[in-house]
Amino acid sequence: MKILSVNVGLPREVLSGKDIVTTGIFKEPIEGPVKLRKLNLDGDKQADLTVHGGEDKAVYAYPKEHYDYWQLELPNTALPWGMFGENLTTEGLNEDAINIGDSFRMGSAEVVATQPRLPCYKLGIKFGRMDIVRRFLTSGRPGIYFKVLLEGEVEAGESIELISKDENNITVKDIVRLYVKDNKDVNLCNVR
């Protein structure tokens, strides 16, 4: 597993229909090491802290493998790294294999997987098509939010190392499945 790109962006105002909306979803790849702090990366900020950011959503990672899927789904759409609003574009970090609670070393930082991304309407603003929100959610390709356990630096090209595997075996994808369609799955709902 490795980091392919580190992407940051500050909130900006954009036009959505007739409304002006403030969003932090626009991320750009940057070169060199970047400090990963308890609430975000240096040079990055979330716009609406009532639903975005905080310690449990300090950094958002999205796998390159999903870009391959979306390129087939949206063949006429440019998909540069950061297009999905992710801070880290990764390789090999798959929601099927990552448990909520798994911890990792990324560069000199340590993080723990906390939850999948459940997108808001601002993803639709970024893509210029509101159907992407539903398509993203039902695709089962949510990406992963991480909490920062130990601040450090991250950089494109660095490896992502598993430190410990959570014993509950609830994957990031399991959570999305419960949210989207299988909310009566007794085996998942009864985990303590």
Across the structure, where does each feature detected by a protein language model lie?
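Electropositive, beta-rich accessory/interaction domains or terminal extensions
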Residues: 1-123, 131, 167-192
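Short loop/turn positions at the edges of beta-strands in beta-sheet-rich folds
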Residues: 92-94, 140, 150
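Loop/turn positions that initiate beta-strands
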Residues: 101, 151, 155-157
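Active-site glycine-rich loop that binds ribose-phosphate moieties when present
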Residues: 127-134, 138-148
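Short hydrophobic beta/alpha edge segments that flank linear recognition/processing sites
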Residues: 160-164
